[in-house]
């Protein structure tokens, strides 16, 4: 009745002042574009600021790839313990011409020493997410197929994400065939993982654990209080810096936060923006 109505009204007011604070911080950043998606996983509250703006997905596309791998494991199309060849020759989606990845452009170099050998699917997923290995990503995409990753993302409600290809396909890049996403698309995928809908409940718990082992923590986690865990993924390419995932407060409250940015040349500045937005969001969500 009345109490519930007034609680809802004060929540709406809290969300509105959060929106204003986030918009002010974005303006101050001088960014060309910023997309923010917040979804409370306890209450039916969400906040969207530029959440429909389209960005180059960068390494955020590794999240739907992980989801597809776990769904395939659930359906016994592959085994996580299965050891598959570590290769560094891939085919361009434009004309099938071969290309390889350069160690210098990859945030993880460990896998290159193992080309010609084998690695387990589980290990490749771990490298793809925690250290954002491009090589692991392309090996897994060849295994699960980008078109299937795309269909799964759409089925989960990420209705405008485009997962077209692996990483560093120069021909595709020149042809404008890029992986793109909105903050909302990614937020919907993280919510599906958090709520155990992206794959089996067991697989979703495992995906959260992998995301919690993320090594790049200069963005969202830097804005969170000690003891608050983020299960998240980052993405960085030239002047495009992203971070997003599932935040678990100490009292068990959980929410999804995604921040996508374009046009901030300085990585330290975009990291500060993400951390500040995380601080604002956490203050508002945890206070309610």
Locate each region found by the language model:
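Structured C-terminal helix/loop/strand segments within mature extracytoplasmic catalytic/sensor domains
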Residues: 14-25, 143-145, 188-218, 229, ...
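Solvent-exposed, acidic/flexible segments
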Residues: 15-19, 31, 54-63, 77, ...
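Extracytoplasmic
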Residues: 29-34, 42-44, 50-52, 56-60, ...
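Mid-domain, small-residue-enriched loop/turn segments at the edges of structured enzyme/sensor domains
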Residues: 33, 117-121, 125, 131-195
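Active-site SXXK
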Residues: 44, 56-89, 95, 128, ...
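Conserved catalytic neighborhood of penicillin-recognizing serine enzymes
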Residues: 91-138
């Amino acid at each position: 009745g009345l109490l519930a109505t007034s609680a809802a009204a004060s929540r709406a007011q809290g969300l509105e002042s959060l929106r204003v604070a986030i918009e002010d911080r974005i303006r101050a950043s001088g960014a060309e574009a910023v997309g923010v998606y917040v979804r409370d996983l306890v209450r039916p509250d969400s906040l969207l600021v530029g959440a429909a703006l389209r960005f180059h997905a960068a390494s955020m596309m590794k999240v739907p790839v992980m989801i597809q791998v776990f769904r395939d494991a659930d359906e016994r199309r592959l085994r996580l313990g299965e050891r598959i060849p570590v290769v560094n020759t891939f085919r361009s989606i434009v004309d099938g011409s071969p290309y390889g990845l350069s160690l210098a452009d990859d945030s993880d170099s460990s896998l290159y020493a193992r080309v010609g050998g084998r690695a387990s699917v589980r290990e490749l997923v771990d490298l793809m997410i925690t250290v954002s290995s491009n090589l692991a990503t392309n090996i897994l995409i060849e295994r699960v197929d980008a078109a299937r990753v795309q269909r799964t993302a759409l089925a989960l409600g990420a209705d405008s994400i485009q997962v077209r290809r692996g990483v560093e396909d120069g021909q595709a890049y020149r042809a404008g065939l890029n992986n793109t996403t909105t903050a909302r698309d990614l937020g919907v995928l993280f919510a599906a993982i958090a709520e155990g809908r992206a794959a089996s409940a067991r697989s979703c718990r495992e995906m959260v654990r992998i995301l919690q082992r993320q090594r790049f923590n200069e963005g969202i986690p830097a804005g969170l209080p000690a003891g608050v865990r983020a299960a998240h993924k980052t993405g960085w390419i030239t002047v495009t810096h992203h971070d997003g995932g599932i935040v678990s407060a100490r009292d068990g409250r959980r929410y999804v936060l995604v921040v996508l940015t374009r046009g901030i040349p300085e990585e330290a500045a975009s990291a500060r923006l993400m951390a500040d937005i995380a601080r604002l969001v956490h203050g508002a969500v945890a206070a309610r």
